[in-house]
Amino acid sequence: MTQAVMLQGTASDVGKSVLAAGLCRIFYQDGLRTAPFKSQNMALNSGITPDGKEMGRAQIFQAEAAGIMPDVRMNPVLLKPTSDRQAQIVLMGKVATNMDAVSYHDYKPRLREQILAVYNSLAREYDVIVLEGAGSPAEINLRDRDIVNMGMAEMAQCPVILVADIDRGGVFAAIYGTLALLHKQERDRVKGVIINKFRGDVALLYSGIEQIESLTGVPVLGVMPWLDVDLEDEDGVTLQNGKYKGNDDRDITIAIVQLPHISNFTDFNALAAQPDVRIRYVRRPEELADVDLAILPGSKNTLSDLAWLRESGMADAVLQTHRQGVPVMGICGGYQMLGDTIVDEVESGLGTQPGLGLLNTITRFAQDKTTTQVNATMSGELPGWLAAAAGLPVRGYEIHMGETVLQEGCCTAMTLQKNGCPVADGAVTADGLAFGTYLHGLFDSDAFTRAVVNGLRARKGLAPWETTFCYAEHKARQFDLLAEAMRQHIDIDKIYTIMQQHQEPV
């Protein structure tokens, strides 16, 4: 008999993903085989499973919290916005098509049977499934074809816990309004509420909690404080809210250009966790002043973001930063932008477009998407700030729909191992001031990250920082801290009771 519980929210960014990871960690600590599940995820942060399937990063880090490998069944539908109106539809880890919102809304009912089959397949292998909804279940305009909130809870026949964010204000109105807009059978599925991101003395909430419980008949299971834990975020809302402002007193400042279609900004979590690194996400030219490294990150729409760079003045600012002797790095779409030429006869129909010209490369977009985890070795000789990383092993993953060819003046940055064969990747100039790669997750490799950060320190005349920091251990500690806080502030025994009362045979 598989047990399940689903977290839904009063809005986006209320903390569902993190709390779901916390429950995964708690059940894992308690000896239960646990898996996360989100039927449909809309995010530009994605990752690759060991068998080369693409899925949302949120379910990947939830799987890590549960002590298991990610499995594409944990996120069967991934929507990756390519513009304000279009999204790439990824089904079971592979690109299916592109659709606008209206077309996808009409298409969703055809996915229900497949989603339920995938969920049941996963549930047969685990003791507990922790499901996560998307946005709010009270989107009454989407209710009739819902496959991710109450529609999914109905398919899984599981209880729901509603998560509300008090930090944004109006928490009791959000709880009451959400429950009021649900149908009776949907309200009956909601067995508890968690108030999240509270700052201050919880005693101030007691009278409000009593009233909201009386008004709704739904118990508040706990009040989670605002936690200082370093865990991944699902989408760009956290960037807009300025979460990654960094620490002013750190020696090294790394600027990441916040592209309109930025993807996989989780690439930089390991950098931000370094004790001497300050991460700064930038959107204005003046914000590139006084940085030690500028990075163009991944993009879901390379040519659109390249046009934005030029229109916003950021392209000139990046080039000026480079002329001042500051290294510029590009990852995936950012790597493509650093080149001389981008040829797109597939995606945008814009044909041949000039890049920023910092790397003498030509990129051609392709129909097929490369999705794979890879091991790699940095080139044996690397210049400048990269020198100490020469020959180091690294690990990461590729998600791209293009091929980049190096021209005269560029050297290969690393060699990937694919099916036992060496494959060149990336480019670096002779002075090391321009460096690009398709490899996401590069900074999760501790030795590489410390080598390049120390290379940046050396450029400033600073001594190398010798540290035994391990990012994997750091993440494990964060999961444990989250679980400890949830046990302290949430009635976990009550959640167990809720699940046991609603467990279903699969």
UniProtKB/Swiss-Prot annotation:
InterPro entries: Class_I_gatase-like, CobQ/CobB/MinD/ParA_Nub-bd_dom, CobQ_GATase1, CobQ_N, CobQ_synth, GATase_3, P-loop_NTPase
Keyword field: Cobalamin biosynthesis, Glutamine amidotransferase
GO biological process, one term: cobalamin biosynthetic process
Pathways involved: Cofactor biosynthesis; adenosylcobalamin biosynthesis
Record's keyword annotation contains Protease: no
GO function term, MF aspect, one: catalytic activity
Domain GATase cobBQ-type: 251-448
PANTHER family on file: COBYRIC ACID SYNTHASE (PTHR21343:SF1), DETHIOBIOTIN SYNTHETASE (PTHR21343)
Annotated function: Catalyzes amidations at positions B, D, E, and G on adenosylcobyrinic A,C-diamide. NH(2) groups are provided by glutamine, and one molecule of ATP is hydrogenolyzed for each amidation.
Stored NCBIfam families: cobQ (TIGR00313), PRK00784.1 (NF001989)
Protein name listed in UniProt: Cobyric acid synthase
Organism of origin: Salmonella arizonae (strain ATCC BAA-731 / CDC346-86 / RSK2980)
